């Protein structure tokens, strides 16, 4: 008997651990363990919890077609999860537990405990690199060191990369679940002891998600480099939630991208999308090799000396989308209402929080994780530290997004703003990015500016220069 432990890899197709178990020729069982207390500590978004719950029902059906039952337990935290998986493995008389690696520190420690408990029972623990196309540690400098800058990492990644070939799984022999374990089999009536927000606008079944990937790579990726920065357009893939919980693998995305390309030659848009996938790999690799990133520490040494003002009232207004800067407010309201935010907008609001309001990037990082359906620790941490200029290969500290010019450039007619900030629907495009200049501003029920961007830019330059010494 082989037991596969699912975590953030909720798919039966192109799942390294599952494929290894199926290829063993032995009966296979699967397990998912919910850890609500740990999720609270990690600020898991209720909308992502709901997507995970819905996905489990789909995964159970996919596994049933392979004659693999899905067991489910809810325990408090990662330590209890390690105990639970070792107990189930013992009960099943499993000879091996297989799982795909998570790279964050808490997750690594969970797996170390599981390995220890299983070893004491004579059960083999096998962990696989499945989250990335190229596993952490495989992309190094000529001196054998890890890359700390993205561009040379990308060049090395492309040199090592070969378009993946993805095969199909074959069912294993059917086996009957012991009656003593019947109550542990997943059924849709089960629910997490954790808040959930409806995620049904996002598909949970693999075929719909796979079709979305196919259609994007076939029909829209060619314009990705031009369309991706405009939030009013459908210019992005919207696949990030499925990468975050593992409905899709990065390999599947890259394989489909090349499959739909002409003679294996990527268009400019396809190259830019591939570059974004490599950014994702870069941040995953960093988290795997830099434990301090999992402790919410600045990547750069001088980041610890940065002075943050951390005004609670201003932070709350930022969270609610009431800063008086329309593109910032539209973005935050999109996040709060849908659980998703366009990538260009993530950079704008992160820059505004850290460099206009002088609020610690960790506050924004946690808030994003608590709201995003595509919350992924490595990507979220990497993005926030990039914007705050404290991260690995972060933007220069003197690069400070102007929320007015960003809105004018990427939402020139104000279509996105009008969608999410109804107070400004009657304001013409000439004034919508700076409503404080609107002649009839007193008739508009929209917040005044929290701060003056020009003044706060000078403050930021001073604070960062002081921290850098």
Curated annotation (Swiss-Prot):
The keyword Lyase applies. It is an enzyme of class 4 (lyase). It catalyses: cyclobutadipyrimidine (in DNA) = 2 pyrimidine residues (in DNA). Residues 1-133 form the Photolyase/cryptochrome alpha/beta domain. GO terms for biological process: DNA repair; response to light stimulus. It comes from the Bacteria. Involved in repair of UV radiation-induced DNA damage. Catalyzes the light-dependent monomerization (300-600 nm) of cyclobutyl pyrimidine dimers (in cis-syn configuration), which are formed between adjacent bases on the same DNA strand upon exposure to ultraviolet radiation. This is Deoxyribodipyrimidine photo-lyase. The gene is phrA.
